[in-house]
């Protein structure tokens, strides 16, 4: 018998005594189907040895950490790129090495001996996350795409509030029924309603005493609407226009209607003519607006907004609102650490929001009852994302304490707010200090003056450049709009400094005051004759100076108060000057009452010509100080803090107080003390709200314009500044830059992005509960890369957009292989990960290890393996599988081969080799 030993079916069995078909247990063949061969052909990446399989000693953990800290960045692609690896492999290896360094830092923090060591490691870890995100977003690629968080084809910006509402204005709900008596109204109130369109306006009086009693929403609505309808429309000659029935045609179409759209009954103002509608109560008592901070050992400071209604009468204090910057990363951290459990019906989950330190430094109230608060926050306010360590903020509140809008300076380094004032043109002026990067310049600590319009759009910002670290403390605006800013300069060991700017913010003049010691300007004001008043500390001596506002070098007089800490300054309508502060000994001047023996708060009344002063003490014998003062209708009001008992028993570690002092005699009329157990009260800032104790809040309304006016500019609603930028790369093409303009809106920015992305992405502005967002969505088969604008000028972070690569898979092709090399993989990382605590480090370590595993998976996706073959053949990964027809063919081959093998068994047993 002749045997064909070259047969492809029998060859292996003749040589080895076995056959290849016996390797297929469970009917799984070890040969490549046509589908496998087609899919495998796409896997062309050259073989490489990944870092995690390379031989070498990593060294001890401490030596690894030391080496990492010496690196300029944890992302070090040099050794990898020098090997000329394929782009996908190079990116995967670089990402792995960076993650491995983050792992070492996290492991060291878990076992770190002290909190200070972990804090040091946290700085390196946070910077490493940032560097890794930047690298991953723009890493070289061919078939493999990595994402810092999760792969996505779409991103959305922070929400931008829509422009001011028009047509209909909804008030706050205040009653359960429209005809229910409004108990907070006496029925004798009088209102002035002003309706304006262009140059035309009318102020309409409404007296509730002539209507039904007690007042209800229905009765007040009728009174207001009847009064508005009684104003006739007149022709050019002054004659009254009549309708077809001979009745006068109303000039205005505004109507106040009871409405329940907010859940309870209030007012809805229908305004089909789009007029500007304002309201105020006539002859209402005065009020004080109070802003202060409360801190405790377990939480950062936030700003509380309060109002004292009728402070010369009933003096009713109420808390209206709070200003607190959101700590975005701490909030996300809390969400990461929160226990996971199913919702329980009727039980509300605790809030996971975490807040950053937010402190107010100054407040001013306008004639319409709105207030402006300036200060410093380390968190986000609405769509204003803090870009550096902290930022200056400006918040507008309506007469009821509701936030109308919030603004941040947008400094990429550090900025702090110091003072706020109103200009004669209605503009808002703020002063502060900026350190680090700002508007493309690096500052070492410079004073800044910024101007805003009534809608919160920035009009100008002026840095007062000087060598060394200067600090702004004070601000004043004169009747002609001239702006004065004061504080402490760095020269001479610390000199008092004053600068004058014109009404448009241009710097015109500087002056330094050097007593030979440590000097500073603590407060500024405009005197009754237009002169500049500067309250200074000169070598520890409190001094009030009168300075020529047209030429700062000319002193017009001065008065010394002694060794005091004088910080507050105000001017009465008759020219009397008020000074507030603290002192540990008697203040120079006529003594109205006795000192307390400790550090005492004081208020000094100084004559306009600086020839005399009278001093009143607010003292307990403990620690007392006055932070702010204001004049209003024959009284001086002082806001401050005490660690003693001024008007009742102290509640907190330190309490706040507001004192009323007779402006003529200096006698202390009354004091309100307030605080919370275990809490420390921050400086108390007050502002006079003349006529501010109205009943409008009881009607769900507010003083002034009833529609909230807010700028639609991105440079107003976000922390973006003109000149900030980012770039877009489409399908690995050339990066094209987008620069933010001063008048940028969501619409104009969307248009800029659309011009670059063209048909490769969908750009929309979807609307949500918080406003509209910028949405960028890569279209199928295309890649959109978002690139940050660089240090100090990055627009992406301020828009809430990541530096990322948006990848949209190509359309599904039924004829394409089931498995292709590469793909999109997410590292599932976040900047909320931190290693400053052992708990946080343990969580971060787990996430980094998962990211390492994902990077290894991404690398393996570039190479063919049996698992991929199984998927192509229709089985689950790693299980194999063949079609029934293929299995039947294999069974026949195995049967034939078995018979051949039995005939040739002797070749092997006989020592064929």
Name each model feature, range by range.
Residues 1-152, 215, 219, 234-241, ...:
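Amphipathic alpha-helical polymerization modules
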Residues 156, 163-167:
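Polar/charged heptad-repeat coiled-coil helices used as signal-transmission/dimerization stalks
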Residues 115-146, 181-345, 349-350, 358-372, ...:
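Extended, beta-strand-rich, solvent-exposed assembly scaffolds of outer structural proteins
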Residues 178:
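Short amphipathic, basic-aromatic surface patches that mediate peripheral association
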Residues 169-173, 269:
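A eukaryotic intrinsically disordered, low-complexity regulatory tract that is acidic and Ser/Pro-rich
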Residues 681-716, 722-727, 734, 741-742, ...:
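Extended alpha-helical or coil "stalk/linker/tether" regions that are enriched in polar/charged
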Residues 149-159, 776:
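Short, surface-exposed polybasic-and-hydrophobic patches located at secondary-structure transitions
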Residues 107-114, 382, 799-802:
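Short, flexible helix-adjacent loops and helix caps
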């Amino acid at each position: 018998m002749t045997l064909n030993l070259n047969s492809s079916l029998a060859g292996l069995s003749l040589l080895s005594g076995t056959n290849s078909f016996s390797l297929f247990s469970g009917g799984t063949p070890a040969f490549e189907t046509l589908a496998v061969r087609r899919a495998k052909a796409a896997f062309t990446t050259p073989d490489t040895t990944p870092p995690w399989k390379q031989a070498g000693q990593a060294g001890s953990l401490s030596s690894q950490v030391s080496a990492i800290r010496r690196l300029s960045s944890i992302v070090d692609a040099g050794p990898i790129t020098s090997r000329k690896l394929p782009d996908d492999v190079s990116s995967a290896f670089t990402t792995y090495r960076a993650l491995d360094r983050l792992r070492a830092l996290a492991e060291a923090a878990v076992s770190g001996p002290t909190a200070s060591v972990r804090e040091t490691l946290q700085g390196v870890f946070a910077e490493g996350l940032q560097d890794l995100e930047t690298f991953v977003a723009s890493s070289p690629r061919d078939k493999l795409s990595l994402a810092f968080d999760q792969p996505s084809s779409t991103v959305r910006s922070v929400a931008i509030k829509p422009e001011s509402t028009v047509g209909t204005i909804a008030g706050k709900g205040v009653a359960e029924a429209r005809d229910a008596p409004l108990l907070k109204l006496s029925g004798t109130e009088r209102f002035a309603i002003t309706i304006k369109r262009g140059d035309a306006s009318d102020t309409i009086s409404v007296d509730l005493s002539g209507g039904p009693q007690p007042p209800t929403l229905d009765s007040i609505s009728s009174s207001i609407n009847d009064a508005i309808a009684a104003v006739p429309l007149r022709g050019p000659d002054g004659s009254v226009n009549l309708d077809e029935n001979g009745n006068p045609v109303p000039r205005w179409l505004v109507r106040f209607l009871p409405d329940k759209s907010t859940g309870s009954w209030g007012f809805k103002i229908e305004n089909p003519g789009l007029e500007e509608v304002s309201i105020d109560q006539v002859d209402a008592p005065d009020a004080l607006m109070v802003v202060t901070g409360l801190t405790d050992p377990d939480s950062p400071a936030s700003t509380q907004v309060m109002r004292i209604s009728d402070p010369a009468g009933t003096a009713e204090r109420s808390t209206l609102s709070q200003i607190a910057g959101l700590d975005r990363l701490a909030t996300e951290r809390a969400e990461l650490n929160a226990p996971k459990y199913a919702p329980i019906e009727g039980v509300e989950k605790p809030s996971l929001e975490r807040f950053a330190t937010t402190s107010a430094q100054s407040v001013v109230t306008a004639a319409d009852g709105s207030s402006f608060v300036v200060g410093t926050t380390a968190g986000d306010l609405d769509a204003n994302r803090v870009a550096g360590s902290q930022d200056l903020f400006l918040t507008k509140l309506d007469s009821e304490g509701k936030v109308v809008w919030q603004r941040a300076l947008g400094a990429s380094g550090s900025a702090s707010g110091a003072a706020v004032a109103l200009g004669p043109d209605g503009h808002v002026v703020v002063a502060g200090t900026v350190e680090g990067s700002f508007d493309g310049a690096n500052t070492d600590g410079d004073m800044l003056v910024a101007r805003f319009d009534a809608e919160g759009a920035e009009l100008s910002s002026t840095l007062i450049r000087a060598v060394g670290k200067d600090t702004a403390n004070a601000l004043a605006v004169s009747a002609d709009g001239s702006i004065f800013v004061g504080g402490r300069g760095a020269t001479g060991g610390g000199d008092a400094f004053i600068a004058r700017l014109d009404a448009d913010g241009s710097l015109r003049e500087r002056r330094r005051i050097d007593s030979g010691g440590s000097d500073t300007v603590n407060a500024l004001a405009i005197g009754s004759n237009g002169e500049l008043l500067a309250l200074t500390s000169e070598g520890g001596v409190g001094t009030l100076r009168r300075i020529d506002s047209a030429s700062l070098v000319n002193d017009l007089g001065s008065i010394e108060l002694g060794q005091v800490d004088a910080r507050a300054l105000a001017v009465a309508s008759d020219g009397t000057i008020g000074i507030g502060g603290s002192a540990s000994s008697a203040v120079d001047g006529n003594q109205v009452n006795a000192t307390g023996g400790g550090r005492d708060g004081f208020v000094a009344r100084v004559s306009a010509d600086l020839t005399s002063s009278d001093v009143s003490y607010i003292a307990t014998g403990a620690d007392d100080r006055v932070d702010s003062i204001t004049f209003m209708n024959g009284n001086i009001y002082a806001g401050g803090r005490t660690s003693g008992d001024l008007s009742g028993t102290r509640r907190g570690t330190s309490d706040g107080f507001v004192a009323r002092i007779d402006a003529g005699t200096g006698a202390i009329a009354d004091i309100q003390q307030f605080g919370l157990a275990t809490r420390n009260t921050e400086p108390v800032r007050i502002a006079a709200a003349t006529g501010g104790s109205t009943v409008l809040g009881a009607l769900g309304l507010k003083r002034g314009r009833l529609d909230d006016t807010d700028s639609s500019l991105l440079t107003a609603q976000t922390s973006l500044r003109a000149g900030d930028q980012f770039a877009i790369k489409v399908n690995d093409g050339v990066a094209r830059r987008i620069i933010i303009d001063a008048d940028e809106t969501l619409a104009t920015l969307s248009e800029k992005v659309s011009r670059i992305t063209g048909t490769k992405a969908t750009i929309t502005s979807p609307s949500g509960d918080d406003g509209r967002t910028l949405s960028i969505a890569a279209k199928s088969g295309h890649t959109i890369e978002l690139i940050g604008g660089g240090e100090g000028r990055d627009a992406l972070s301020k828009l809430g957009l990541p530096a990322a690569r948006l990848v949209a898979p190509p359309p599904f092709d039924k004829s394409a292989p089931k498995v292709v090399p590469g793909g999109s993989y997410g590292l599932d990382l976040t900047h909320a990960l931190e290693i400053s605590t052992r708990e946080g480090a343990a969580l971060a370590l787990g996430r980094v290890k998962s990211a390492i595993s994902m990077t290894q998976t991404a690398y393996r996706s570039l190479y063919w393996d049996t698992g991929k073959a199984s998927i192509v053949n229709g089985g689950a990964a790693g299980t194999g599988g063949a079609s029934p027809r293929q299995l039947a063919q294999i069974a026949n081959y195995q049967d034939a081969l078995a018979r051949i093998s039995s005939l040739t068994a002797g070749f092997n047993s006989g020592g064929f080799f």
